[in-house]
């Protein structure tokens, strides 16, 4: 895993929906799209839009897989944090903690 370089505020992760997605996938390798959608109470469009932002930033990976339980051609989408995503989330959480405790200013990784 790529180590976090300390508290770094991340604008991409900071969006409430994206923060919740990252937190949900933080301690597991991957989750199925519908599980994330249903757990967070999101619409397909909202989840898809936010996963695209995270994916474009290299913070999550997505893969499609056929399901033997489905009778149609649709595939399941699996979502997981990348190593970069895990490191960014850890740095962001540390930055939020530092901000909440008033112990210093966290750097911002967005340009």
Feature roles, as predicted:
Residues 1-6, 23-24, 84-111:
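Amphipathic alpha-helical dimerization/coiled-coil segments
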Residues 1-16, 57, 81-83:
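N-terminal leader segment of winged-helix/HTH proteins
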Residues 8-46, 68-75:
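N-terminal helix-turn-helix DNA-binding core of bacterial DNA-binding proteins
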Residues 42, 83-84:
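DHp/HisKA dimerization-phosphoacceptor four-helix bundle of two-component histidine kinases
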Residues 48, 77, 82:
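Ser/Thr-centric signal marking residues that sit
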Residues 51-52:
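Short, hydrophobic-biased segments on the C-terminal half of alpha helices
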Residues 56-72, 80:
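Beta-hairpin "wing" of winged helix-turn-helix
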């Amino acid at each position: 895993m790529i180590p976090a370089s300390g508290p770094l505020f991340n604008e991409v992760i900071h969006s409430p929906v994206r923060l919740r997605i990252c937190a949900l996938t933080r301690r597991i390798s991957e989750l199925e799209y519908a599980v994330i959608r249903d757990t967070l109470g999101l619409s397909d469009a909202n989840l898809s839009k936010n996963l695209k932002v995270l994916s474009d930033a290299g913070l999550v990976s997505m893969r499609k897989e056929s399901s033997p339980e489905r009778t149609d051609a649709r595939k399941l989408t699996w979502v997981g944090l990348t190593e970069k995503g895990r490191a960014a989330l850890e740095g962001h959480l540390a930055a939020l903690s530092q901000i909440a405790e008033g112990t210093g200013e966290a750097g911002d990784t967005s340009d």
